[in-house]
Amino acid sequence: MHSLQSFLFLLLLGYGVFAAPTSPQAQSQGRSFKVERIKRGNSIHGPTALRRAYRKFGIVPTTFGVDLSDFVPFNTTSISGTAANLVTDVQEPEQTGAVSAQSVQNDAAFVSPVTIGGQKIVMNFDTGSADFWVMNTELPASAQVGHTVFDPSKSSTFKKMEGATFEIKYGDSSFANGGVGTDTVDIGGATVTGQAIGIPTSVSNSFVEDTYSNGLVGLGFSSLNTVQPQQQKTFFDNIADSLDKPVMTAHLKSDGVGEYEFGIIDQTKYQGDMINVTVDSSGGFWQFQSAHYKVGDGPIQTIQNNAVAIADTGTSLMLLDDTVVNAYYAQVKGAQYASSAGGYIYPCNTELPNLAVAVGAKHLATVPGTFLDFAEVGINKTTGQTVCFGGIQSNQGTSMQILGDVFLKAFFVVFDLRGPSIGLASPK
């Protein structure tokens, strides 16, 4: 159990401490359901996680630092496993309606089995997007290798949406696009009939190579959905009215079993008070004010730019304003920016300070330094020390900060469509 002191919430003002087709139909037994997550023990690669985050939000790196001659990167071929073989690890206790959600590459990504038209597909739950799309048999055969693909022809409930298309395109020209259909989707025993699903006929190599996941379940706001000519609702929006409460909770612990849970806020999963902050959903993200930060025992500082943040389960790292990143690594012994790694690195035996970031206008949420040590990345040629890649990296001056799984797994998090709002509490 985490100690309450490890997950402090500071009151900023007083510095007090407290921790278009037929409308989709939803069916949810018990009016709540959960998607469990089980830890895996594979290796991770920090620069890859950072590149994926940059690709997702169209961020172009501009920072330069030490080059490849300063350290020897580890060979990333040690990363093994595919989304196809993750399905065999799934457990489905009938009495709870629970399904497994695996953390792959030591928390580099969280994936979960989803049933589409009777076919079980491992996918990524992503609060930073709003499209439900899946790798499928309409893609070229070469793009299907290593993936578990959805076959529309084998689903008796699949219906093509004539004239409808979707397109996800990122700043570096990564993409997925194609047609759209509807089908019955089951997640943890909760079923939506007529869920809109992107059926790409073309995807970029970045999606082909990501064999840990076969698609995305977008859990952002439906205004972010890319389906044309008429936007479609997310799975969360479609299931919301059938739930006891229109909420999703994320309990993404790094040291054991955790879960996503819909329809209920389980008070046995957290301790102490929960803070709730207003979300600005106008851009389609779970976005809130985040204008302050605090490194270790230092003073509370103000961020002049990028004073908003989003909570994003589809991103591994914390991508923060350069002011925060530079101030943080100034307190990390031996830290330096490495252009070959794409971010800040430091000797792995360095003890990292805690980092507190503002959540809303009144509160700071503290992430323990142990959570911010993301991955080993190589060997220092001069000292022979193992070098690590930080879980905090630059957002390269973009308009928002991105709080990914490095942040989220430190808390019990509530995504609440009422308001909307986000709640944070210290997890048990």
From Swiss-Prot:
The active site is at 126, 312. Keywords: Aspartyl protease, Glycoprotein, Hydrolase, Protease, Secreted, Signal, Zymogen. Gene3D superfamilies: Acid Proteases. One of its GO terms (molecular function) is aspartic-type endopeptidase activity. Residues 20-90 form a propeptide. SUPFAM superfamilies: Acid proteases. Residues 110-425 form the Peptidase A1 domain. Glycans are attached at residues 276, 380. GO terms for cellular component: extracellular region. Residues 1-19 form the signal peptide. It is found in: Secreted. It is an enzyme of class 3 (hydrolase). GO terms for biological process: proteolysis. PROSITE patterns: ASP_PROTEASE, PEPTIDASE_A1. PANTHER family: ASPARTIC ENDOPEPTIDASE, PUTATIVE (AFU_ORTHOLOGUE AFUA_2G15950)-RELATED, BETA-SITE APP-CLEAVING ENZYME, ISOFORM A-RELATED. This is Putative aspergillopepsin A-like aspartic endopeptidase AFUA_2G15950. It comes from Aspergillus fumigatus (strain ATCC MYA-4609 / CBS 101355 / FGSC A1100 / Af293).
